[in-house]
Amino acid sequence: MKIVINGIGIAGPALGYWLTIAGHAVLLVEEAPRLRAGGYIIDFWGIGYDIAEEMGLIGEIRRLGYQVRELRFVGRDGRKRGGFDVTVFGRMTHDRFTSVPRSDVSATIYRAIEGKVVAIFGDSVAGMDEQEQGWRVTFDQA
């Protein structure tokens, strides 16, 4: 089956990964001209960690992540007001925890499927029309 996924963030490439394994032809479409950089730091643990491990990506995600040792609360003046040692998270998750930039997670998943999917950057899905033989997808730029 041919499948179009709109968005190359985290969910789009992750879905593309599993659909490709299932034998589907995947087209990823991203409005940005390239993979996005930056973004916020996410705490990576629990089911997301388990899935990345199943995908064979957890080593790279941990390498790119920050092994945070302390969480600090600071005032407007920049002085520490409180905080705690985050080793409690390590104990609670059996050391299956890292903090990693969102764009690094996205890029790691995308690299795992690059060459196995078709990716279009700088465009987005404009519409879809059901046809007798399937769906017709139109794009903003193409």
Predicted region positions:
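Beta1/beta-strand and adjacent pyrophosphate-binding region of the FAD-binding site
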Residues: 1-11
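Conserved N-terminal helical subregion
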Residues: 1-3, 20-22, 45-142
